[in-house]
Amino acid sequence: MIIAPYRWNLAAVVLLLLFCSNPLTAQTDVHTLAGKVDQRYDHMRTLEARFTETYSGAGINRTESGTLLMKRPGRMRWDYDQPRPKVFLTDGHTAWFYVPGEKQVRRTPVKQLDDLRSPLRYLLGKTKLEKELDGLSLAPDRKPLNPGDVVLRGVPNGMGDRIEQTLLEVTPDGLISRIVIEERDGSATEFRFLQQKENVEIPDRQFRFTPPPGTEVVAGTEFTE
């Protein structure tokens, strides 16, 4: 089940250069780190990764997993395979959400999409991390999952009314291994990224969607089940 409709408006994310020789430390300068993140993603054409998405809030705890594909400019595809199949994708202009076996598919222009995942598509573009996340800073009070990683915090532009903070965990080689979105209602969504592969060949057809025959197309800005 996709959680809270707007879970993509995250804006850019955090990393170091691939060839950074020194491990990240709590003393890392935020401005320098943000610049390295921007440079890293500016040179990335595609990204493929396994992901785990965990939601907790309102007495609900839910974990899903699947494969994420991203391609410049602004295209991404989330293929959920556990606990049941479903697909979210965007070609940079239109976003689609479809659960196989259902009689309808949801569609909306990307510019109208109200979901916290959507800004992830800007990772493979000319992004400026410090401009995308208000109050970007180190989060020494939040322990990273893996030794050597650094955790940053900030609030996505224009989302302070619903987002308490967004946490970004960065690995020593400059990859984002985790994103945590903590909302003002007390709920939290965590994305973990594994087996990340950069600049692999991803066909454009992966970001196109044709509704199966007999499927109703429903317009809307929120993608929930």
Where are the language model's segments positioned?
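Bacterial N-terminal signal peptides
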Residues: 11-21
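Bacterial N-terminal signal peptides that target proteins for export
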Residues: 2-12
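An acidic-aromatic
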Residues: 67-119, 189
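Envelope-exposed proteins and targeting segments
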Residues: 45-47, 64-66, 72-74, 84-86, ...
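Gly/Pro-enriched, hydrophobic low-complexity segments
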Residues: 28, 131-221
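Flexible, surface-exposed loop/linker segments and immediately adjacent secondary-structure boundaries
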Residues: 103-148
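N-terminal leader/targeting segments and the immediate start of mature chains
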Residues: 2, 24-62, 211-225
